[in-house]
Amino acid sequence: MLGIRVIPCLDVTDGRVVKGTNFVNLKDAGDPVEVAKQYNSDGADELVFLDITATHERRDTTVDLVRRTAEKVFIPLTVGGGIRTTEDIRNLLNAGADKVSLNSSAVKDPSIIKKASDKFGIQCIVVAIDAKKTGEHKWNVFVHGGRIDTGIDAVLWAKKAAAFGAGEILLTSMDKDGTKDGYDSELLKAISSSVVIPVIASGGAGKVEHFSKACEYGASAVLAASLFHYKELTIKEVKEHLKSKNIPVRQIRAEFAINN
């Protein structure tokens, strides 16, 4: 089994990292380049960089900010927000992104998933799903930063995205986002059991035990934002906890250097 990835998420708007609860009440959490540099040093396996208002405001993700971030970090960087065409994807990859995250544009036109994976490789294409519970064992897909209910069933959409060529799913529970009371186990199990591609769990991490629970529910990677931004937990603490539960993790680079 491959090591579970521990991934901080940088939600960015107006050039600043922000964090809120249930996708609203955003608070400033720092400069994205400086925050990314710190996570790189702290042993994060990857970074997710989401311009959370780019699609809603119909503006492009700031390629310059991506370039400046990529120059300072040496771990895989996934970038999303306002990506509508394969040319947008090319520009971000050329700026230093390793992967791109498609959300609203993929829901509007699923063929962009196939076009992108054919052109750039399946390993570059992440489909982000923002899901909210709408009934018993049912979740709908929301787009435009969680503002619009598409009426699309999240499990069916995950299957479709995988069939079109998504390399992995970034699954965010809107109900759990920012609450710190744990990942949405029911949603995570429903999605991870319906696809064969990796699923990144997002939304709700509040204590170290939540990360191991997400792995039990089928997550291939665990993502958090405010916990890490506000130093309530460190990457190292999460990895040590996972190891204590016999869940394989990737070594922090300092440990790797010592052991070699």
From Swiss-Prot:
A GO CC annotation recorded here is: cytoplasm
Please give the SUPFAM superfamilies that the UniProt record associates with this protein.
Ribulose-phoshate binding barrel
Compartments (UniProt record): Cytoplasm
Keyword Lyase set for record: yes
Taxonomically, the superkingdom here is Bacteria
The chemistry this enzyme catalyses reads: 5-[(5-phospho-1-deoxy-D-ribulos-1-ylimino)methylamino]-1-(5-phospho-beta-D-ribosyl)imidazole-4-carboxamide + L-glutamine = D-erythro-1-(imidazol-4-yl)glycerol 3-phosphate + 5-amino-1-(5-phospho-beta-D-ribosyl)imidazole-4-carboxamide + L-glutamate + H(+)
- Its EC number is 4.3.2.10
The UniProt keyword set, sorted, is: Amino-acid biosynthesis, Cytoplasm, Histidine biosynthesis, Lyase
Question: Kind of enzyme, top EC level?
Answer: lyase
**Which GO molecular function, any one, fits this protein according to its record?**
lyase activity
- Main subcellular location of this protein, as a coarse class: cytoplasm
Q: Which InterPro entries does the UniProt record give? A: Aldolase_TIM, His_biosynth, HisF, IGPS_HisA/HisF, RibuloseP-bd_barrel
Q: Where is the active site?
A: D11, D130
GO BP annotations of the record are: L-histidine biosynthetic process
Quaternary structure?
A: Heterodimer of HisH and HisF.
HAMAP family from the entry? HisF (MF_01013)
Q: Which family does the entry's similarity section mention? A: Belongs to the HisA/HisF family.
Q: What is this protein called?
A: Imidazole glycerol phosphate synthase subunit HisF
What species was this sequence derived from? Endomicrobium trichonymphae
Gene name of this polypeptide: hisF
